[in-house]
């Protein structure tokens, strides 16, 4: 399993990707998100969110989370939800970054980007949904039994992904292009 020092980097990356993909698939199930069968418009949004997240990507960020947890003696499964939350934020950023107003990319991982597969407004809302879902996942008891740890995870992700982190970096990138 992931987190074992006897594994090669490639083996660890593959194992982390599989664990993360399975966790993301469960998190992004329609019933998991809505708690019940969704309305048709929510079904389209969830499909766009799944398009943004599932079916590709190296999953390096989840590997780093899982391997960091292993340094503290935690098994991979105990870090799976935190790793998935980080990947949800990453995929949200890609869904927004691909939009015509930003990088205007039409392909991601060999597939149409969210805005090309659906439309721009759906890509924006899918990205927004992924971002908020990441914080919801971190707040769940299944992520960690200690509420203080969950709050610390939420706070750390908010700082890293906000104006002083990833979003600020994207703004600098776009300003440099003008």
PLM regions: where:
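Membrane topogenic helices and adjacent juxtamembrane segments
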Residues: 7-10, 17-20, 29
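Outer-membrane beta-barrel proteins and related beta-barrel translocases across Gram-negative bacteria
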Residues: 32-37
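Short, Lys/Arg-enriched N-terminal segments with co-localized hydrophobic residues
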Residues: 1-6
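Mg2+-dependent prenyl diphosphate-binding active-site environment of isoprenoid biosynthetic enzymes
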Residues: 12-15, 25-28, 39-178
């Amino acid at each position: 399993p992931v987190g074992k020092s006897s594994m090669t980097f490639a083996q660890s990356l593959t194992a982390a990707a599989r664990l993360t993909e399975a966790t993301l698939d469960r998190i992004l199930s329609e019933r998991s998100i809505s708690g019940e069968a969704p309305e048709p418009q929510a079904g389209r949004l969830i499909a766009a969110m799944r398009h943004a997240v599932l079916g590709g990507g190296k999953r390096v960020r989840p590997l780093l989370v899982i391997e960091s947890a292993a340094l503290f003696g935690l098994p991979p499964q105990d870090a799976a939800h935190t790793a998935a939350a980080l990947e949800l934020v990453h995929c949200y950023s890609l869904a927004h970054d691909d939009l015509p107003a930003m990088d205007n990319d039409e392909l991601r991982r060999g597939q149409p980007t969210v805005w090309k597969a659906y439309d721009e407004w759906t890509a924006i809302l899918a990205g927004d949904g992924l971002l908020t879902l990441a914080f919801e996942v971190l707040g769940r008891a299944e992520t960690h039994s200690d509420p203080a740890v969950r709050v610390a995870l939420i706070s750390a992700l908010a700082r890293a992904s906000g104006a002083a982190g990833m979003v600020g970096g994207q703004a600098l990138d776009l300003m440099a292009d003008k």
